């Protein structure tokens, strides 16, 4: 296996624990990502290959990949190697993992998508690579061209590597818009020019330069640029060309003649882009430039076959993907009889749209629009598979939450717009009118005024009224100088400050009256109003100084000047919790903390390697400060000692803005030059507070005052307004205050993405009155008893909109005329069924169905079913009414599920359960009566199936909380809890489980057990914050408190006490708290149990004594003896092994324990593999077997396990479970052999059932699918790149995914490095 090469040296040595670090993971977790839109500047900015497509923002390329299980595309990676505008992208035709991209800094990059790294780079090209393309006839050759040429050919590797100039393609008379290689004819290439002409080069033929200009331009020097150009994939000589004004032509490159000129329906329409449809010969699609109309054409017709309006804004570029095969249902087609009787079934033609005889080919078009919108349109089904309506296409300089709504985030961008996003759905809610130049900074009006002030590079400042959608005020005091920062005073809503490159910080009222102009010796970059004094403002200046001004006096001199930075100061920020404290970030790479009252710099934070931009104080923890830098990182600081607590590497470029909302103080948003906005959860930084809340500790251990909290070594305490407000509200309550406390703190500490939704559902289940549900409840996942009610009222509100259809039909063939005549005769003869079948043959289903009841209701129903089957076969939405009319709920639900429309499926299944759909009782087999209850039963099962599928979809997308919501919505509490635990949302699981009570108890207890394991290591989680020893002791107590919340807790408490490494006195204290005998008594109890030959008790008490290592040989020999017998089961040996694994780490690592330790690791590895099979942790089963085999091979041990047997067992498991593990494109299925079946059957006999049903299946933490990007790690378990959160092992180098770490730790407590150190990723 790949991973062994990484860590095999661990298995060689026996002194590996020397110099080990602590295993760790980032405390700051990425929980949301808002991708940029597609840039509108350059032509070839979207591309596709196989099951991936990509598009370019200005500085980053976004790559989406098909998830075969759900048949949907997901963001897979972000490439941000370019530092200047990207000009073009081209996918390699020979290798689906490679693409080439160019940028305006004369750079071409070859990037490998699978490995997410640069394969080759061509620097300082002659001229800007404005257009580029892989050569079709050579493996690794890329051609690129600047605006005027020549064409450069770059051979990337091999003996001929280097750049040469194409021998003919140079000295053009007009700039090049684009060029295209012929896909079959070697070396044939066409260029489109700004003057409307084409140049064609074909080796061995005469070169044709500047030919085929549109006829209207002949003899003039007017320009009509070529906007699109594509060779016909089925011809050697034909190509489609589009000119901006002249439109579309099909031309012949050999005879240099125009074959067809295509006509658009109106003179106003013009085409922006085009693409051939590979699955339909002769068919192509175009996108209009003014409005988002997609037109479908066939070369045989000069007018479009169909016109689909997809969006208000015009197209920018198009690319057609060959669709992946859909999951289809098998529907039996009618048997084809050799003779035709009056009642035999007709074979219908494919359905035709109203106006023409054609069916859209299967295929997906990647559509990019001028407003940055990107979508994937399914042409066959005529629906969006995915659409991101609009996005920033450039660097985002600033982001801020709306003061009165933590769900709305505003962003300001280089692209000249401010956009407001709903962070729960990551969709744009409002966008400013635009054309403002570059917007560097924004500031919300205080309270609910619903206005945003923006500062721009050339056009002064403005106020945008978000609701009205218009600019209501402009400020031009700085002239055309750039405004780097704008700050609306939150204590006095009439004042706005701006600072500019002209050296002034100007304070004015919102109606434009200037109050102060503070002159600085150089440009001013940052300003911030004090949170405690409405008249104090601080500025950051290019002269390296920070100044503080007092606005209440008329003086224009600063009160204080702080010097110390060695380069320009950018942002300054006042602490919200500590009066007189402010911080500043500088180009010298440091952050300085200043104390206004002491006139001094009280701390310097060193760590960034480039200028610092974003700065943010936490609004609850007074010493927590976060900074973002041009070194692409975000750093979290404890300003008490000036230590860096965490560094986040996920952004792919400079980090500019950081923000959080006081009512969600541990959710942070960041924005960057990589043109993404990312959401982060900082909750892990305050884990002790969270657990104090769960354990119902006193308020003193949750909320504190600032002076106490900033003492070094103090555990984190909440000191902000929000926590104080919650406390006040709770102290007012008389009843169920614990429930409210858990809910309110949970909502404050959890990131967006479903926790509010989850709590609403918990309230519904606990019987809360519907009138208390919040306004937005119906937007989320509703409890099923509300689903139909809310959807019905929604339907009444919606009014119908008439859609206009473009006309155009084809003459009807003669055969159809004859059939119609025949049908009329049959009808007059009373042969209704024959008439109906002929109508079916003509495709006139509606006529057939309207007459069919004249034959019989049974025949009508059968005809309806045939129609439904045909529509499903063709994947048409029209099937829905047919299925509903005949009550065929199952077919409809399966249809929706196969298309991934899980929410639709859920709605139908619920309607059926509520009895809104009547199955037609037509004919019943003799003696059987199908009661309504049985139908109800059927529908209920269907409902659960759909809910489960929807939950699974959310879950594998890294949205465990929403997955839990799906289960709560149908009252499935057990599964809802299981999904929270599998998503590692342990604190949330305990909160919700505590409120839900009895029905959630088993899962709540398991979550408490895992949380206690987390607590056991909290001092390890915070190695850098320097918590003192008493704090570690506090955490042992905290773990004990959690375990005491579990009714049957003795064994859990024993494990906790066994693992605790203190002095005897501390250990006895803990024993006392856990109601266990003292260390000395345990020693005697162990000796007694040993004399009685009671293995479990002996092991238990030795572990609790001063000499826990005595337990090892006793426990291990018991397990070895058991495994040697043939009929052992997991449940007999696992309890002993599990207990042994809690031996104190420093005792286990003693040299005298080497052999026992190695045997314990091997047994835990093997039993871990079996547990992983039982829990269906497919991704780590092979690694656990491999780990056990490696230890067996490399360590001196005598264990009744053979490497050969382990590999047979693994092969048997693979063979017998491959049908469930196979993904669509894997190798062909080979059935398991008889011996493999026998081995696997024995294995299953040993495993028995998992006691907690719901927790079977892999773990997926929140954000598992989000691409990180400057930070790529290879998993030492799989050898593959880790997507999502990473967990570093104790050597500080080896990494595994957090998901794998969680699953591993649940089945085998010891690290995969074989060191004997416990793994704690919780």
Swiss-Prot record:
The keyword Repeat applies. InterPro entries: G-protein_beta_WD-40_rep, Quinoprotein_ADH-like_sf, WD40/YVTN_repeat-like_dom_sf, WD40_repeat_CS, WD40_repeat_dom_sf, WD40_rpt. Keywords: Repeat, WD repeat. The keyword Repeat applies. Residues 330-345 have a biased composition (Polar residues). Gene3D superfamilies: YVTN repeat-like/Quinoprotein amine dehydrogenase (2.130.10.10). It holds the Pfam family WD40. WD repeats lie at residues 81-121, 123-164, 171-211, 221-261, 266-307, 391-431, 434-474, 478-518, 519-559, 564-604, 607-647, 650-690. Residues 328-352 are annotated as: Disordered. This is WD repeat-containing protein 17. It comes from Homo sapiens (Human). The gene is WDR17.
């Amino acid at each position: 296996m790949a991973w062994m090469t990484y860590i095999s040296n661990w298995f060689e040595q026996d002194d590996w624990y020397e110099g080990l670090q602590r295993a760790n993971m980032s405390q700051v977790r990425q929980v949301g990502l808002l991708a940029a839109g597609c840039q509108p500047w350059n032509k070839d900015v979207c591309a596709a290959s196989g099951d991936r497509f990509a598009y370019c923002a200005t500085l980053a390329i976004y790559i989406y990949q098909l998830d075969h299980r759900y048949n949907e595309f997901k963001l897979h990676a972000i490439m941000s190697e370019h530092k200047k505008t990207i000009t073009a992208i081209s996918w390699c035709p020979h290798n689906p993992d490679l693409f080439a991209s160019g940028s305006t800094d004369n750079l071409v990059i070859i990037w490998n998508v699978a490995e997410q790294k640069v394969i080759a780079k061509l620097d300082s090209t002659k001229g800007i690579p404005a257009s580029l393309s892989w050569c079709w006839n050579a493996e690794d050759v890329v051609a690129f061209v600047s605006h005027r040429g020549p064409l450069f050919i770059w051979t990337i590797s091999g003996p001929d590597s280097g750049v040469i100039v194409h021998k003919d393609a140079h000295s053009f008379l007009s700039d090049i818009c684009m060029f295209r290689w012929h896909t079959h004819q070697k070396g044939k290439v066409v260029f489109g020019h700004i003057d409307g002409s084409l140049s064609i080069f074909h080796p061995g033929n005469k070169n044709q330069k500047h030919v085929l200009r549109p006829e209207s331009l002949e003899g003039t020097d007017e320009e009509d640029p070529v906007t699109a150009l594509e060779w016909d994939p089925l011809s050697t000589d034909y190509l489609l060309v589009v000119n901006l004004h002249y439109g579309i032509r099909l031309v012949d490159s050999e005879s240099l003649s125009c074959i067809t000129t295509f006509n658009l329906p109106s003179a106003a329409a013009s085409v922006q882009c085009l693409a051939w449809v590979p699955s339909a010969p002769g068919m192509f699609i175009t996108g209009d430039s003014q409005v988002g109309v997609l037109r479908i054409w066939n070369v045989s017709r000069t007018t479009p076959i169909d016109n689909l309006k997809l969006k208000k804004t015009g197209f920018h570029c198009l690319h057609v993907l060959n669709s992946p095969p859909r999951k289809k249902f098998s529907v039996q087609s009618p048997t084809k009889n050799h003779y035709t009787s009056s009642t035999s079934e007709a074979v219908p033609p494919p359905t035709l749209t109203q106006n023409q005889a054609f069916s859209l080919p299967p295929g997906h078009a990647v559509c990019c629009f001028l407003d940055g919108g990107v979508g994937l349109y399914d042409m066959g089904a005529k629906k969006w598979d995915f659409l991101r309506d609009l996005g920033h296409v450039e660097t985002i300089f600033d982001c801020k939450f709306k003061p009165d709504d933590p769900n709305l985030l505003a962003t300001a961008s280089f692209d000249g717009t401010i956009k407001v996003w709903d962070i729960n759905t990551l969709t744009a809610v409002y966008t400013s009118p635009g054309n403002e130049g570059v917007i560097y900074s924004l500031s919300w009006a205080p309270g609910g005024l619903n206005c945003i002030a923006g500062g721009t590079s050339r056009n002064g400042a403005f106020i945008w009224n978000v609701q009205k959608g218009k600019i209501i005020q402009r400020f031009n005091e700085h002239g055309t100088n750039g405004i780097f920062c704008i700050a609306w005073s939150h204590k006095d809503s009439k004042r706005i400050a701006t600072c500019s490159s002209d050296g002034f910080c100007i304070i004015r009222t919102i109606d434009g009256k200037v109050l102060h102009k503070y002159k600085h010796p150089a440009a001013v970059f940052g300003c911030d109003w004090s949170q405690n004094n409405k008249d104090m403002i601080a500025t950051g200046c290019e002269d390296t100084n920070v100044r503080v001004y007092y606005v209440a006096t008329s003086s224009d001199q600063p009160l204080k000047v702080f010097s110390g930075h060695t380069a320009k100061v950018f942002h300054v920020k006042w602490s919200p919790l500590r009066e007189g404290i402010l911080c500043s970030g500088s180009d010298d790479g440091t952050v300085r903390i200043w104390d206004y009252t002491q006139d001094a710099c009280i701390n310097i934070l060193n760590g960034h390697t480039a200028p610092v931009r974003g700065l943010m104080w936490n609004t609850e923890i007074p010493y927590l400060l976060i900074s973002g830098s041009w070194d692409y990182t975000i750093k979290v600081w404890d300003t008490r000692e000036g230590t860096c607590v965490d560094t986040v590497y996920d952004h792919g470029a400079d980090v500019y803005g950081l923000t959080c909302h006081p009512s969600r103080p541990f959710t942070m948003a960041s924005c960057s030059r990589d043109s993404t906005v990312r959401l982060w959860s900082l909750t892990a930084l305050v884990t002790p507070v969270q657990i104090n809340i769960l354990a119902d500790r006193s308020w003193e251990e949750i909320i504190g005052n600032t002076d106490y909290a900033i003492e070094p070594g103090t555990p984190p305490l909440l000191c902000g307004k929000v926590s104080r407000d919650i406390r006040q509200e709770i102290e007012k309550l008389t009843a169920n205050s614990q429930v409210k406390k858990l809910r309110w703190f949970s909502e404050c500490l959890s990131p967006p993405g479903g926790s509010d939704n989850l709590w609403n559902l918990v309230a519904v289940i606990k019987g809360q009155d519907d009138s208390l549900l919040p306004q937005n409840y119906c937007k989320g996942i509703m409890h099923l008893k509300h689903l139909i009610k809310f959807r019905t009222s929604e339907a009444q509100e919606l009014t119908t909109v008439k859609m206009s259809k473009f006309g155009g039909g084809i003459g009807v063939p003669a055969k159809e005329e004859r059939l119609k005549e025949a049908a009329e005769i049959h009808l007059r003869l009373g042969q209704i069924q024959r008439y109906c079948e002929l109508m079916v043959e003509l495709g006139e289903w509606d006529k057939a169905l309207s007459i069919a009841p004249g034959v019989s209701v049974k025949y009508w129903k059968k005809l309806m079913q045939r129609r439904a089957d045909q529509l499903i076969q063709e994947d048409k939405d029209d099937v829905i009414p047919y299925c509903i009319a005949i009550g065929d709920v199952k077919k409809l639900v399966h249809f929706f599920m196969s298309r991934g429309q899980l929410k639709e499926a859920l709605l139908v299944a619920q309607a059926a359960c509520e009895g809104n759909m009547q199955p037609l009782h037509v004919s019943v087999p003799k003696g059987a009566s199908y009661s309504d209850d049985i139908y109800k039963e059927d529908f209920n099962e269907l409902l659960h199936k759909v809910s489960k599928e929807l939950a699974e979809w959310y879950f594998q997308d890294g949205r465990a909380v929403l997955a839990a919501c799906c289960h709560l919505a149908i009252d499935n509490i057990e599964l809802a809890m299981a999904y929270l635990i599998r998503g590692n949302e342990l604190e949330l699981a305990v909160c919700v489980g505590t409120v839900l009570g009895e029905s959630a108890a088993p899962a709540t207890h398991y979550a408490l057990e895992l949380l206690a394991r987390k607590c056991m290591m909290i001092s390890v989680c915070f190695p850098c914050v320097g918590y003192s020893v008493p704090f570690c002791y506090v955490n042992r107590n905290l773990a004990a408190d959690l375990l005491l919340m579990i009714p049957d807790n003795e064994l859990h408490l024993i494990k906790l006490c066994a693992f605790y490494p203190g002095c005897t006195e501390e250990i006895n204290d803990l024993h006392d708290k856990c109601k266990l005998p003292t260390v000395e008594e345990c020693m005697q109890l162990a000796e007694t149990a040993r004399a009685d030959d009671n293995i479990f008790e002996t092991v238990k008490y030795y572990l609790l004594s001063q000499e826990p290592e005595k337990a090892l040989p006793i426990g291990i020999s018991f397990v070895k003896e058991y495994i040697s017998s043939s009929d052992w089961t997991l449940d007999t040996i696992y309890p002993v092994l599990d207990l042994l694994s809690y031996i104190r780490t420093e005792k286990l690592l003693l040299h005298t324990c080497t052999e026992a330790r190695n045997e314990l690791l091997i047994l835990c590895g093997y039993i871990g593999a079996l547990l992983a099979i039982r829990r269906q942790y497919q991704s780590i089963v092979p690694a656990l077997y491999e780990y056990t085999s490696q230890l067996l091979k490399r360590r001196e041990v005598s264990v009744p396990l053979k490497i050969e047997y382990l590999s047979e067992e693994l092969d048997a498991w693979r063979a017998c479970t491959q049908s469930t593990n196979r993904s669509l494109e894997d190798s062909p299925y080979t059935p398991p052999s008889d011996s493999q079946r026998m081995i696997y059957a024995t294995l299953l006999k040993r495993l028995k059932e998992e006691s907690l049903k719901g927790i079977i299946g892999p773990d997926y933490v929140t954000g598992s699918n989000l691409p990180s990007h400057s930070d790529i790690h290879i998993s030492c378990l799989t050898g593959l790149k880790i997507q999502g959160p990473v967990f570093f092992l104790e050597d500080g180098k080896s990494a595994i995914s957090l998901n794998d770490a969680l699953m591993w730790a649940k089945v085998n407590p010891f690290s995969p490095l074989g060191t004997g150190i416990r793994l704690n990723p919780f």
